[in-house]
A protein has these predicted regions:
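A glycine-rich beta-to-alpha transition motif near the start of alpha/beta enzyme domains, typified by
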Residues: 1-118, 155-201
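Internal active-site segments that recognize and position negatively charged phosphoryl groups
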Residues: 137-138, 142-165
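Active-site glycine-rich loop that binds ribose-phosphate moieties when present
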Residues: 126-143, 170
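Intrinsically disordered, low-complexity "prion-like" regions in eukaryotic RNA/RNP-associated proteins
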Residues: 121-125
Length: 201
């Protein structure tokens, strides 16, 4: 069988996009892992299946789309960056209004819009639980929070002068693999406050 796919990137993450209307059933996790493999497959951070939530209008557009995001290991979650990429894709294809619409993900509905001033897609997350303090032993700096946006995130606060030579991979891997976050792991973000209203990540 042959299926169309698209490969899009947004702020450092790349995704394989599939029109779910072409698929009688979603692939298994092992297939997703093969596609996302950067040596043997297409290479990607995740796979996005999409389909209109309602019938297309006369112009071929739909204001609400379903988004099924699968991580590179085949697990399902919500991905904020993936939703931005999908909106930009649907907008470019002429399948969603230029101003925005709604994406329905595994954790609920999220509004997407075009940020005219910055000329970038933006997503308004649905209500999420407030951040909580991460366990001190799961942190490398002792200053960390945990927030679940539909996808779990460990936020590690560091000093701005640490960013230049910060070993994101090894430090992040150490936190991701902590027993506290087993068995699925956690997204790890290193964030520095560089001004009254400025963050670097």
């Amino acid at each position: 069988m042959h299926f169309n796919f698209w490969k899009w990137e947004g702020t450092g993450n790349d995704f394989i996009l599939f029109d779910q209307r072409e698929w009688p059933e979603l692939p298994i996790a092992e297939d997703i892992a093969v596609w996302c493999d950067r040596e043997q497959g297409l290479g990607a951070d995740g796979v996005i299946f999409f389909q209109p939530r309602t019938d297309l209008d006369d112009s071929g557009k739909c204001a609400a789309w379903e988004m099924d995001y699968l991580n590179a290991d085949g697990s399902r979650s919500f991905c904020g960056n993936g939703s931005r990429v999908l909106f930009a894709f649907l907008r470019a294809k002429g399948w969603m209004e230029l101003e925005g619409g709604v994406l329905h993900a595994c954790d609920g509905a999220h509004a997407v819009k075009w940020h005219a001033e910055l000329e970038v897609p933006a997503v308004q997350l649905m209500d999420v639980n407030p951040p909580i303090k991460a366990p001190h032993w799961a942190s490398s700096s002792g200053l960390s929070d945990f927030v679940d946006t539909g996808s779990p995130h460990h936020i590690e606060w560091i000093e701005p002068n640490e960013l230049e030579a910060f070993d994101v991979f090894s430090r992040g891997q150490g936190i991701r693999n902590q027993a506290h976050y087993a068995p699925d792991g956690v997204n790890v973000d290193f964030v520095a406050c560089s001004g009254p209203a400025a963050l670097q990540m």
